[in-house]
Amino acid sequence: MLDSGASKRHVDMFMQQLEENGLPKPDLCILTHNHWDHTYGLAHLENVTSFATKSTNELLKKMQAWGWSDEEMKNRIETGEASAFSYPHLNLEYPDKSMIKIAPATVEYTDKLTIDLGGVTVKLKEIENSHSYDCAVAYIPEEKCIFLGDIHYEDLLPVQPAYYADSHAKLISGLRKFDFDKVLSGHQMLMSNVDLYAQLANVETV
């Protein structure tokens, strides 16, 4: 399972789709970065070993202590801890903030990690980027497929979201070290490597 979704509702929907398609429940989950829409479902996964970068886990542990009053959420936006872009979406998913449950991953790593699934491997790798400093990709060499999470998106914390020239260049350089032709991400349909690099080339950086 690549990322855990935003909530118990997401996890339940995912499990229902697996059941309807005759597929087994996952026993592994990989987190690509700390943002709530990719991680807050983790607490609702049962009998699953999860993986995250050390940076992601540190951020999730910090979030476990967060309060969710309107004032506390507003303060986190003002201090740059959270994105003004994301909170309206979080409010829709969680009208009752007491339902927010946050769990860190069971296994953490730094820089890179290879998971052997038996005939198929998943290579996890941190790459510098604009979106969030803890981002990592998941690459399956046997399938020539890479899962990006949100690593190819801009930083949403500033009032004006931004791609940073140096970090963006390092992202492209880091991705070119992988031989892939299929690209999956957190918020887009399946695309080719050609589509991805065209998208990355067509952004304004600061």
Where do the protein language model's features map onto the residues?
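Conserved beta-strand hairpin/beta-sheet module of binuclear metal-dependent hydrolase folds
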Residues: 1-19, 137-150
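Divalent metal-coordination and catalytic microenvironments
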Residues: 3, 18, 33, 45, ...
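Active-site-proximal loop/helix segments of hydrolase catalytic cores
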Residues: 121-175
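Short, solvent-exposed loop/turn segments at secondary-structure boundaries
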Residues: 6, 158-163, 194-198
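Active-site metal-binding motif and surrounding structural segment of the metallo-beta-lactamase
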Residues: 9-55, 176-183
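Active-site metal-binding loops of divalent metal-dependent hydrolases
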Residues: 3-6, 33-34, 55-56, 127-129, ...
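Divalent-metal (often Zn2+) His-rich catalytic cores of metallo-beta-lactamase-fold enzymes
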Residues: 51, 139, 166-206
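Metallo-beta-lactamase
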Residues: 61-125
